[in-house]
C-alpha cells in the first residue's frame, strides 16, 4: 500500500527502480550471456565508430571544429600512454589504451545519461555495461594479457626473472601481485559505476518532483575519472612490464 502511494506521488519512480542481479539471458548452446550488456555495448561501439567516422572523413591540414576536437582527444590519449609507458615504446599501445578509455567512458556515460529504465525488458534492465562485474573482469583480464605480452615480447623468458628480484623471498608476493592487479581494476570500476547508479536512483526516489541533476552531473564527472584511472593504470602496468627497455 505504501509503495503504491509512493509510486503515484513520485512521477519519476520508474527511474528509481533498481534490479540488482537480474539479467536478460541469451542462450547459445550451453552458454548463458547477459543480453542487456551486449545490447548497450553494441550501441556504445556504434556511437564511437560513428563519431570517429564523422570526425575523420574530411581531414584538413588546418583542423577546424570537430576535427580539432578529435585531435585533442587523440593527443590526450597519446599523453597517457607516453607518460606511463615511455616515449620510445608507447606508440604501439596507443590504440589499446585509447580503446579502453573511450569504451569505458562511453559505457559509463550511457548509463548516466540515458534513461534505460523507460525501456522494459522481459527480465532485467538496460544499464551501463560497466556495472556488470563480468564486463569489468573481462577488461581487466585483457590488461593482464597485454602486460604479460609486453614483458615477454621485450624480455623473452627473462621477463620471469622479475619474480625473484631483488630476492627470491619475494616470489610469492610478486606472483600474488599479478592476481591483485586485475582484481583491483575490475572491482574499482564495477563498484564505482554501480554505486553511482544506486545513489542516483535513491535520490530520484526521495525527491518526488525534480530529478537530482547535481548528483547526475557529479556521476558524469566520476565516470570520466574512472575511465581515466582504468586506462592510466593499464598503461602503467604495461610500462612496468617493459621497464628497462624504454631507453636506447
UniProtKB/Swiss-Prot annotation:
PROSITE patterns: ATPASE_A. One of its GO terms (cellular component) is proton-transporting ATP synthase complex. Keywords: ATP synthesis, CF(0), Chloroplast, Hydrogen ion transport, Ion transport, Membrane, Plastid, Thylakoid, Transmembrane, Transmembrane helix, Transport. It is found in: Plastid, Chloroplast thylakoid membrane. The chain crosses the membrane at residues 35-55, 94-114, 133-153, 202-222, 224-244. Its main location: plastid. It comes from the Eukaryota. It holds the Pfam family ATP-synt_A. One of its GO terms (molecular function) is proton-transporting ATP synthase activity, rotational mechanism. Key component of the proton channel; it plays a direct role in the translocation of protons across the membrane. NCBIfam families: ATP_synt_6_or_A. F-type ATPases have 2 components, CF(1) - the catalytic core - and CF(0) - the membrane proton channel. CF(1) has five subunits: alpha(3), beta(3), gamma(1), delta(1), epsilon(1). CF(0) has four main subunits: a, b, b' and c. Belongs to the ATPase A chain family. This is ATP synthase subunit a, chloroplastic. The lineage of its organism: Eukaryota, Rhodophyta, Bangiophyceae, Bangiales, Bangiaceae. The gene is atpI.
